[in-house]
Curated annotation (Swiss-Prot):
Organism listed in the record: Aedes aegypti
Compartments it resides in: Secreted
Cited function: Modulates blood feeding of female mosquitoes on vertebrate hosts. Inhibits collagen-induced platelet aggregation in the host via preventing collagen interaction with its three major ligands: glycoprotein VI, integrin alpha-2/beta-1 (ITGA2/ITGB1) and von Willebrand factor (VWF). Prevents collagen-mediated thrombus formation in the host. Binds to host collagens but not to laminin, vitronectin (VTN), fibronectin (FN1), von Willebrand factor (VWF) and fibrinogen. Influences cytokine production and populations of circulating leukocytes.
UniProt-recorded Gene Ontology molecular function terms: IgE binding; toxin activity
Protein name, per record: Aegyptin
Length: 273
């Protein structure tokens, strides 16, 4: 603005000078003044040129400032664009992170499904193994049952136990009051029935084969014992001693029990083969 003010003041001074009347006797002076005026005019022109130069410089400076502003705007735009780019990159990063999270979730679900599938397969395998074990156990149980059945059919000890129990049941003499007679008859049963019968069954393993051989043994033995009891009472009524009467019964019972044992031994020998 200062060059413009100077220029305006200069024009005002020139106008004032030119508006003043020039005296005739002072023409040379006027001429000199003209020269001065022309010099002043030239000075004014130079000043104008200087002002123009200054104005050009100012214009150039304004243009430079404007350029700087434009450059600043461009920089600002670049910064804004950079901000947008950064924001876009952040959005892209978030999208990538979201995709990664989604991928991880999908992978986790797949792993969980695989684990469940493996567990189910393991459960199926365990079930099949249990089933095989159960079936194996069932087979073993059947085999054991068959073995037990076979052992029962071929168990001489079982045959012995059943025969002895039957002899104890059918050859009891505990009901006899006389101690002498009871002891005498018990000795006869032991020597004539129990021992020979046990020897007869030997190693027979299937008791059912010889079970019929003992069907009448109890009845036959009881008949002999009953007869000897009657004879013993008859002997005692004759004023004989108890010992003597028991000895008589002992000899008679022995001869009556032998046929019973012979019949059993013959039956066992034929059926036990």
């Amino acid at each position: 603005m200062k060059p413009l003010v100077k220029l305006f003041l200069l024009f005002c001074l020139v106008g004032i000078v030119l508006s003043r009347p020039m005296p005739e006797d002072e023409e040379p002076v006027a001429e000199g003044g003209d020269d001065d005026a022309s010099g002043e005019s030239e000075g004014e022109e130079e000043t104008t040129d200087d002002a123009g130069g200054d104005g050009g410089e100012e214009e150039n400076e304004g243009e430079e400032h404007a350029g700087d502003k434009d450059a600043g705007g461009e920089d600002t735009g670049k910064e804004e664009n950079t901000g947008h780019d950064d924001a876009g990159e952040e959005d892209a990063g978030e999208e990538d992170a979201g995709e990664e999270d989604a991928g991880e979730e999908d992978a986790g679900e797949e792993d969980a499904e695989k684990e469940e599938g493996e567990k189910e397969d393991a459960g199926d395998d365990a079930g099949s193994d249990d089933g095989e074990e159960d079936s194996t156990g069932g087979d073993e149980g059947e085999d054991n049952a068959e073995d037990s059945k076979g052992s029962e059919k071929n168990d001489p000890a079982d045959t012995y136990r059943q025969v002895v129990a039957l002899l104890d049941k059918d050859t009891k003499v505990d009901h006899i009051q006389s101690e002498y007679l009871r002891s005498a008859l018990n000795n006869d049963l032991q020597s004539e029935v129990r021992v020979p019968v046990v020897e007869a069954i030997g190693r027979i393993g299937d008791y059912s084969k010889i079970q019929g051989c003992f069907k009448s043994m109890g009845k036959d033995v009881k008949k002999v014992i009953s007869e000897e009891e009657k004879k013993f009472k008859s002997c005692m009524s004759k004023k004989k001693s108890e010992y003597q009467c028991s000895e008589d019964s002992f000899a008679a019972a022995k001869s009556k029990l032998s046929p019973i044992t012979s019949k059993i031994k013959s039956c066992v020998s034929s059926k036990g083969r």
